């Protein structure tokens, strides 16, 4: 009888330990694409997409270079011409990408934590009987351990 009660409680313990890990990893993979898609569509309302932004910046750089070349040909510029500040554009784009990735990961972790909490809460409320069996099994184990230490 004790073995029959101990086996479901051990399975329940394994269920409580392994389920959140499995759910978290699977939801991270599944929800990541959905959240990125949602985030990019929301961002596209106010900002350009990365591809459009890169194309526009490349065109501006080409236009600046062409205008500098045109002015050099006309002889209006000195011989020491500095390059346009393209590094600033690249740094801003990199910073925006890092910031967006950070927001995406925060949303992803928050959503998976809520899902895991809901699953654990549901399994706790549905499995109170299993927890009682598990609790009595742990108490019996400690009593036996205490008796063996005294002996």
Swiss-Prot record:
KW Ion transport (keyword) present: yes
Any one GO biological process: potassium ion transport
TM helices/strands, residue ranges: 7-27, 107-127
Coiled coil: none
One Pfam family, short name: CemA
Catalytic activity: K(+)(in) + H(+)(out) = K(+)(out) + H(+)(in)
One GO CC term on file: chloroplast inner membrane
Keywords, comma-separated and alphabetical: Antiport, Chloroplast, Hydrogen ion transport, Ion transport, Membrane, Plastid, Plastid inner membrane, Potassium, Potassium transport, Transmembrane, Transmembrane helix, Transport
Annotated GO MF terms: antiporter activity
Protein's membrane topology: Multi-pass membrane protein
Domain of life: Eukaryota
Compartments in which it is found: Plastid, Chloroplast inner membrane
UniProt-listed InterPro entries: CemA (IPR004282)
Similarity field: Belongs to the CemA family.
Protein purpose: Contributes to K(+)/H(+) antiport activity by supporting proton efflux to control proton extrusion and homeostasis in chloroplasts in a light-dependent manner to modulate photosynthesis. Prevents excessive induction of non-photochemical quenching (NPQ) under continuous-light conditions. Indirectly promotes efficient inorganic carbon uptake into chloroplasts.
Protein known as: Potassium/proton antiporter CemA
Gene source species: Aegilops crassa (Persian goatgrass)
């Amino acid at each position: 009888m004790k073995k029959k009660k101990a086996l479901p409680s051990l399975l329940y313990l394994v269920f409580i330990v392994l389920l959140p890990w499995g759910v978290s990893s699977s939801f991270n993979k599944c929800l990541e694409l959905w959240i990125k898609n949602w985030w990019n569509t929301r961002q596209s309302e106010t900002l350009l997409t990365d591809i459009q932004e890169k194309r526009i910046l490349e065109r501006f750089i080409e236009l600046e270079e062409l205008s500098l070349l045109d002015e050099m040909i006309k002889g209006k510029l000195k011989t020491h011409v500095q390059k346009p500040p393209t590094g600033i554009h690249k740094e801003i784009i990199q910073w925006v990408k890092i910031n967006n990735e950070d927001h995406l990961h925060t949303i992803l972790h928050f959503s998976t934590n809520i899902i895991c909490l809901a699953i654990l809460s549901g399994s706790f409320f549905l499995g109170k009987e299993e927890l009682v069996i598990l609790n009595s099994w742990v108490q019996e184990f400690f009593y036996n351990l205490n008796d063996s230490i005294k002996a």
